[in-house]
Amino acid sequence: MAGAGDGARAVKRNAALLALGSILALSSALVVAQDAPESLLPPGFDKPRPAPPRAAPAPVTVTKGSTSSGSSSVSVPVVQQVPGAATPVAAGLPAGVRIPTLQELEAMSPDELDALLGLKPRSDMPPAARRSRKQVGVLADYEGGLPAGALAQQSGALVRAALDGNKGQLVSRWGHILLRRALASRLDAPQGMNPADFAASRAALLVRMGEGDAARAIVQDVDAGNYTDSLTRAAIDAYAFTADITGICPVISVQGGARKDAEWRVLRTVCQAFQGDGAAAMAQLDRMQGGKVWPEIDMLLAQKYAGAAGKARRAVTIEWDGVSEMTPWRYAFTIATGLEPPAALMRGAADRYAYSAALAPMVPLTARAEGADKAAAAGILSSAAMVDLYSQIYAQEDITGDWSDRSSLLRDAYTGETPADRMAAISQLWDGAGNPRVRYSRMVLTAYAAARMPVEDSFAGQSADLVASMLAAGLDGNALRWAAQAEVGSLTWAQLTLAAPGRGNPVTSGALESFYSDDNSENYRKSRFLIAGLAGLGRVDQATAADFASKLEIDLNRQTRWTRLITQAADVNNPALVCFLAGVGMQGDGWDKMTSVHLYHIVSALNRVGLGAEARMIAAEAVARG
């Protein structure tokens, strides 16, 4: 891990140690000189011989009118002082400064020596490579990100509240994708908000959303020397989520003693091991054992991880007896050392561990697929990523059982001899899900296979699910092939009416009544979402919308502080603020937590600020999953 900066710092440290050693030696010599015995030479022998008296120079008379050729010159000898002739004077140490003993120096870590000798780095980047904090993010506007200056004139307090107040769990897959894009964009900080703190709030929300890789990219876009306390905290959480434990080491090296908590002490010691001081680091971790700093299981996992950096390679036995819960660093150290967490602990664990497993390359493929069954519905994994994962499972001959069977079904969904064979394989993948969320993840998985299905009457009964599967991956063009076959008032028709890029004629009240009469969802939720989406997209006239909303006993014009804020953001054409506020309005663990009023304002605001494609997908998803 040592780079050019570490090498230069090591040279400086050695030079400083030599200088410190010289001071120690010189101070010792002075003490010896003060306590030396009296001279044994006879009196006078230790005194320098007096210099002979110097003769006065003879006066020189200059004759008037004499020329330069006739003048006499007297050479004056140049006397140069002999080096060392002057009495040496020891440079005094500042008052209150104590020189460490040799034993203390030997016990110091490299970071402590750097701090003692004034070699502590102020940045993890050389001067020529340091980056501006003006725009922090990973997506420029020409790469699909939002406009950089969208928040420059906005209130920092409002933006902070929208980010910090979001718990990270959104009901909509497409809402999650949109918010991730907004958070990862290269943006100027809003007024009155430190750019590093702005990056911290975005990274922290991405971690809560399960987007560890995006969060890590955000914190890595800021030089460690510019970190604030909040950004340091967000970075620790991001590296824990991705199990990239040594990724935090540059931050710890620069921030040094900024924190003294147990987490920081353990991570600092682990980083010390990977900086080449393995023996001292392992000894320090040994002293932290016994539950004094971290729980015993966490200290053992940290020792196992740090031990990989040293030459000793000592064995560490991990015993899970008595461990009742999973924690972020416990999980990170477990998968980073190649271990599998106990199944009993993972059954009741939070979704963040499933999301982490789905993205972690060191986790077994079957465990990743199990995590993907949750991550895809949330919006963390794309359809292409799911297909790639199942393809790896199919290629592994040593994987058997349910996951092997599912990978074979996915292959049949693409390569079945007849459309009926392909449809049967797709249906088996859907129906094999244990709950609606997993079923929707399987729809994400089969999106491209669904797009290859022919539009035939024999598949009309599955058309709503086929369309929902295609729209889960944004394949609206493929889904619209079913428009001619879709019966007005059906679920297929409702999804396509919302997902279509444009619509010439507004939806009639008769079509809405037909959909309402066949709506079996709880409290007519699908009908509520349909009218909210159509009104937000402007695809139904106001009178028809008002009449249908009245029948459903909803008031789309009801105002709250949130509705006023997102409407004002749309009025000034601010897509970034609209996205952040839409994220606030989409929080929940299921579509039963979404209201038709919130959906209407979200779809309307997104459509007005140029995010019509996202608005259409969110509206169609709401009807499909409501």
Predicted regions located by residue number:
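Solenoid-like repeat scaffolds
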Residues: E143-Q153, K167-G168, L183-G192, V219-Y227, ...
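Extended amphipathic alpha-helical segments with heptad-repeat/coiled-coil character used for oligomerization
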Residues: G247-P341, L496, A500
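N-terminal, Lys/Arg-enriched amphipathic/low-complexity engagement segments
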Residues: P126-G192, F198, R202
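Long, internal scaffold/assembly segments composed of regular secondary structure
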Residues: L300-L475
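N-terminal signal peptide c-region/cleavage motif recognized by signal peptidases
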Residues: L26-L30
